[in-house]
Amino acid sequence: MDVLPMCSIFQELQIVHETGYFSALPSLEEYWQQTCLELERYLQSEPCYVSASEIKFDNQEDLWTKIILARERKEESELKISSSPPEDSLISSGFNYNLETNSLNSDVSSESSDSSEELSPTTKFTSDPIGEVLVNSGNLSSSVISTPPSSPEVNRESSQLWGCGPGDLPSPGKVRSGTSGKSGDKGSGDASPDGRRRVHRCHFNGCRKVYTKSSHLKAHQRTHTGEKPYRCSWEGCEWRFARSDELTRHFRKHTGAKPFKCSHCDRCFSRSDHLALHMKRHL
């Protein structure tokens, strides 16, 4: 049968328990459902084959008329577009404004990358084609990346260094000192946000990173040498790290310390990046 019986297994067991047997013959309800199914199959529309000779097309003259009308409508729309007043002056002024804003945004992104990038192989950041041309021509030096701290104590130092909060970006006016014409003369990507020059350079082959602090340079050079001087003092733990902030973050796993607290709720986290991910839920 195409339709399953409506009675459940519990009803079948009840019938067997009461009568001692179960009849396999279909009931009136099952006959009725089977009849409804057969009627639906019989009455539904079936796909039929249509030969190509039965397909009717419009007359050839009607087709040509439709094509000519469509062509005329297209020409009229083109004439309307061409008769509209020129907007070259508006486009040029908007383009110049976009160039200025893009240059400001590229400077902000390059400076903010100094405080957020982990120690890694040399990477060049170019936010637009104009920046790429300047880098290739030698007007800009290589990308400058500093070591971002992950512990809350050093985060305070970095926020004081920038003169703003941990989650705030410096304004373009603070980052760009002087006009756009003078920025090429100072030429450099060697100037730090607070005005000091980056004098500590990595001398390993192929690496051109520059830092303002010798401690940051030493921490970076350990990525080349593989040195890990910071050892976990927890009993039974022999983990070693190249940077002190990595050891601090690892040590919180033993102590269970969670110094990063959410300002919207009472949840605390042991790492600042975990707190940043959690804060996105409140947005």
Swiss-Prot record:
SUPFAM superfamilies tied to this protein: beta-beta-alpha zinc fingers
Transmembrane stretches, start-end: none
Principal location: nucleus
Residue spans of biased composition, Basic and acidic residues class: 183-196
Low complexity bias locations: 102-113, 133-148
InterPro entries named among the record's database cross-references: Znf_C2H2_sf, Znf_C2H2_type
Places the protein is found: Nucleus
SMART domains with a match to the protein in the record: ZnF_C2H2
Region (Disordered): 102-198
Zinc finger (C2H2-type) boundaries: 200-224, 230-254, 260-282
An MF annotation (GO) of this entry: DNA-binding transcription activator activity, RNA polymerase II-specific
Taxonomy, superkingdom: Eukaryota
One of the GO BP terms on file: regulation of transcription by RNA polymerase II
Keywords of the record: Activator, DNA-binding, Metal-binding, Nucleus, Repeat, Transcription, Transcription regulation, Zinc, Zinc-finger
Chain span(s) of sequence motif 9aaTAD: 62-70
GO CC field: cytoplasm; nucleus
Domain notes: The acidic N-terminal part may favor interaction with the basic domain of transcription factors. The 9aaTAD motif is a transactivation domain present in a large number of yeast and animal transcription factors. In KLF6, the motif is inactive.
Family: Belongs to the krueppel C2H2-type zinc-finger protein family.
Subunit and interaction comment: Interacts with ZZEF1.
Summary of the function given for this chain in its UniProt record: Transcriptional activator. Binds a GC box motif. Could play a role in B-cell growth and development.
Protein name, as recorded: Krueppel-like factor 6
Organism in which the protein naturally occurs: Rattus norvegicus (Rat)
Lineage: Eukaryota, Metazoa, Chordata, Craniata, Vertebrata
Gene name as annotated: Klf6
